[in-house]
Swiss-Prot record:
Species name: Streptococcus agalactiae serotype III (strain NEM316)
Keyword tags: Capsule biogenesis/degradation, Cell membrane, Exopolysaccharide synthesis, Membrane, Transferase, Transmembrane, Transmembrane helix, Virulence
Protein known as: Galactosyl transferase CpsE
Similarity remark: Belongs to the bacterial sugar transferase family.
Record's keyword annotation contains Transmembrane helix: yes
UniProt gene name: cpsE
């Protein structure tokens, strides 16, 4: 997808600057058609992430030679059908080759850099037994952050040394319940296969996987069935089989972040313009214009969440008295004609203007344009393992819930189902679709209150 943009840019720039009487639609369609043919004939997509920079250079040359050969053949057959000159064609080939190589090299570098950053921030729980733990070597060159350990054949009092190293000790009988409350991204199960039955490892895998937490198991567990997907990878120097409900295309994850940054910049520009007129109206009651609150993000991370204030300053205190009137079933609070909402608040909630400051959260990386809605800390503390699954993806400003009736949904379990559906079926295309549908919902004011 990204390579197509480069090809289109190179072709349109070259043809516009060099070719007289440029027939844009016809010639550009021809260029893109050849690109797709050459892309697959040259195996340009194969082993993309494992190719080194020299191999990438060779692949771009191979792609370019294929492009020249096929284009020349078509030019000969349809020589009177195109306005492209030899100068513009070879200028395009040179520019396109350079830009493709630079783009692909950048994607590889960005992936390597972002993976290192992700690894440093990855919270890992270790599940093992005493014998396997004694054989493990923790190397500084691996940046995964162990935060807790569950030793299946030891009592808590036997784990003094691990406590001394600031590792949280989890009792094997409370493993699932404690992981539900912890900020944890991955679990590493390192235990001999002959003990899997004794300690019900398959049940542990399924329980943790159901939370949306990635599970890494020693590669000997390859024969085990699981409810999601699995891959063989390396983890801390070990060969492991990694279980996850779904593995996403890395190119789509990069595209999602680029989309977030672009959308956040545009959104913040709009937010700044709106704030000039809106802030004085909100502050008429003497309170701040911006409401901020701790919310829970991906896998339990706490971040500061921002909105234009649409409620009274003492809204959180009044909420305690209104809980008996909650119209939501489950771990969310919703009340039609909420008495805490100010006069200007009704307008900005109806038009969704109150959400604009969240573009700052998106730019920071705490949130995404599309995702699940971030719960409050008190709501999160009551989650079970199934409900925590909705936090395995970065929270968003909009999502399936917002375009599926928004305030018409009153059952929290239905929201969880929509969130899990989004996570299971996610691709960059689903995000784009949800953004477009959200614009429609906001412009029509459908379901917003």
């Amino acid at each position: 997808m990204i390579q197509t943009v480069v090809v289109y840019f190179s072709a349109s720039l070259t043809l516009t600057l060099i070719t007289p009487n440029f027939k844009s639609n016809k010639d550009l369609l021809f260029v893109l058609l050849i690109h797709y043919i050459v892309f697959y004939l040259s195996d340009f997509y194969r082993d993309f992430w494992s190719r080194g920079y020299l191999e990438e250079f060779k692949m771009v040359l191979k792609y370019s030679f294929y492009y020249i050969f096929i284009s020349s053949s078509l030019f000969f057959i349809f020589k009177n059908s195109f306005t492209t000159t030899r100068l513009s064609f070879f200028t395009f080939i040179a520019m396109n080759s350079i830009l493709l190589y630079l783009l692909n090299s950048f994607l590889k570098y960005y992936r390597k850099y972002s993976y290192a950053k992700f690894s440093r921030d990855t919270k890992v729980v270790l599940i093992t037994n005493k014998d396997s733990l004694s054989k493990m070597t923790f190397r500084n060159k691996y940046d995964h952050n162990y935060i807790a350990v569950c030793i299946l054949d030891s009592s808590e009092k036997d784990c003094y040394d691990l406590k001394h190293n600031s590792l949280r000790i989890i009792n094997k009988d409370a493993l699932t319940s404690e992981l539900t409350c912890l900020t944890v991204d991955q679990a590493f199960i390192n235990i001999p296969i002959e003990l899997f039955g004794k300690y019900q490892i398959q049940d542990i895998i399924n329980d943790i996987e159901a939370m949306g937490v990635i599970v890494n198991v020693n590669v000997e567990a390859l024969s085990f069935d699981n409810i999601g997907e699995k891959r063989i990878q390396t983890f801390e120097g070990y060969s492991v089989i990694t279980y996850s409900m779904k593995f996403y295309k890395y190119s789509h994850l990069i595209a999602k972040r680029f989309l977030d940054i672009t959308g956040a910049i545009i959104g913040l520009l709009i937010c700044g313009i709106v704030a000039i007129f809106l802030v004085p109206q909100i502050r008429k009651d003497g309170g701040p214009a911006i409401f901020s609150q701790n919310r829970v993000g991906r896998n339990g991370r706490i971040f500061r969440f921002y909105k234009f204030r649409s409620m009274r300053v003492d809204a959180e205190q009044i909420k305690k008295d209104l809980l008996v009137h909650n119209q939501m079933t489950g771990l969310m609070f919703k009340l039609e004609d909420d008495p805490r909402i100010t006069k200007i608040g009704k307008f900005i909630r109806k038009t969704s203007i109150d959400e604009l400051p969240q573009f700052y959260n998106v730019l920071k990386g705490d949130m995404s344009l599309v995702g699940t809605r971030p719960p409050t800390v008190d709501e999160y503390e009551k989650y079970n393992s199934t409900q925590k699954r909705r936090l395995s993806f970065k929270p968003g400003i909009t999502g399936l819930w917002q375009i599926s009736g928004r305030n018409n949904i009153t059952d929290f379990d239905e929201i969880v189902k929509l969130d899990v559906q989004y996570i299971n079926e996610w691709s960059i295309w689903s995000d784009i679709k949800i953004i477009l549908l959200t614009l429609k919902v906001v412009l029509l004011g459908t379901g917003a209150k």
